[in-house]
C-alpha cells in the first residue's frame, strides 16, 4: 500500500477501532426477557477470558485492531498471532498497547507460522 494511504487512512481507522469498541461496550448491558412467573431468561455480559486472535497478512495493523479492540474492551486478555508475512505489525501494536497503559500480559504477541503457532492457538 502507498505510504500516504497507510498514514492517512489505515492508521487513523485502526485508532478509531479502539474508540468505537470502547464506546459500544459501555452501552452493552444484560437484558431480562420475561417468559412466565416460574422462569427467567436473561443475557449476561461478561468477559470470556483469554482470546486467541489470528490476523491475516493484508492490511495487518487495521485487521489486528478489528480483533484486539473488542476483545480488550470487553475485559478479555488476548494472544495475537499475525501472519508470518507481517510479524512486525503485531510487535508494534503490543508496544503501543503498553505505551497506552494496557498492563503487561493483557495483550500478548506470539510469532510463528500458521501451521505451528496458529494451530497451537486454536486448539
Explain the meaning of each model-derived region.
Residues 17-20, 29-123:
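Rossmann-like NAD(P) dinucleotide-binding subdomain of oxidoreductase/dehydrogenase enzymes
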Amino acid at each position: 500500500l502507498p505510504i500516504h494511504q497507510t498514514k492517512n487512512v489505515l492508521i487513523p481507522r485502526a485508532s478509531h477501532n479502539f474508540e468505537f469498541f470502547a464506546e459500544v461496550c459501555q452501552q452493552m448491558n444484560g437484558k431480562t426477557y420475561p417468559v412466565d412467573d416460574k422462569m427467567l431468561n436473561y443475557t449476561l455480559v461478561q468477559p470470556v477470558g483469554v482470546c486467541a486472535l489470528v490476523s491475516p497478512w493484508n492490511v495487518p495493523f487495521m485487521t489486528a485492531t478489528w480483533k484486539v479492540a473488542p476483545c480488550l474492551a470487553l475485559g478479555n486478555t488476548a494472544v495475537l498471532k499475525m501472519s508470518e508475512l507481517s510479524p512486525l505489525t503485531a510487535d508494534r501494536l503490543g508496544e503501543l498497547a503498553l505505551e497506552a497503559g494496557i498492563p503487561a500480559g493483557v495483550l500478548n504477541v506470539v510469532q510463528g507460522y500458521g501451521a505451528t503457532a496458529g494451530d497451537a492457538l486454536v486448539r
